[in-house]
Amino acid sequence: LIRAYLGLGGNVGDRQGALEQALSLLVCRPGIRLVRLSSLYETEPVEASGGWFFNSVAEVETSLGPDELLTTLGQVEGACGRPRLRERGEARLVDLDLLLYGSRIIAEPQLQVPHPRMHLRRFVLVPLAELDPGLVHPGLGTRVSDLLAHLSQLPEVRVVAREWCVARAAERSVP
């Protein structure tokens, strides 16, 4: 099994409800088991339109390959009502990103892992550091906590809820 980290976000409608739905659908899929889930954070939009985002990071174990996992994330986004074709920067009901896939570095047209901008985004690094501050970014060789320490304190990232998702009960999902 591979340990992967997934970014979850959304800034349209019932943001928490949409992320809970996405996570519930995700952990019901064969080959994905939720290990841990960060707190739920509210963040100002960065390079996106619409209202403030709710963001979280899920640590999962998966037997899926990186391409399969990315496809699954897209299927879950679609099941939650996100259109397949969308403009960069538009408001998002649900946005699921593959941040890290073990220690693999993947550079393909449709898949870049680690996520190419994760080290620049507080809304990714704050919840990721909550889960594992000593986690090392495979491409940069730097701990997540150190990456976070070198970023500006803006935009603000604030905790909305520590225990927020009913899908935590699904942490027992079997790959």
Regions of interest found by a model, annotated:
Residues 7, 36, 59, 95, ...:
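Conserved beta-strand segments that form the floor/walls of ligand-binding pockets within enzyme
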Residues 45-53, 64-70, 74-175:
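Flexible, gly/pro- and Lys/Arg-enriched active-site loops
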Residues 1-6:
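Extreme N-terminal starter segment of soluble prokaryotic enzymes
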Residues 10-12, 46:
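A short secondary-structure junction motif
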Residues 21, 25-66:
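Short, surface-exposed acidic-centric catalytic microdomains
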Residues 18, 22, 69-72:
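Hydrophobic side chains in well-ordered alpha-helices
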Residues 14-16:
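Short N-terminal binding/cap micro-motifs at the start of the first secondary-structure element
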Residues 11, 37, 127:
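Residue-level signal for inorganic ion chemistry
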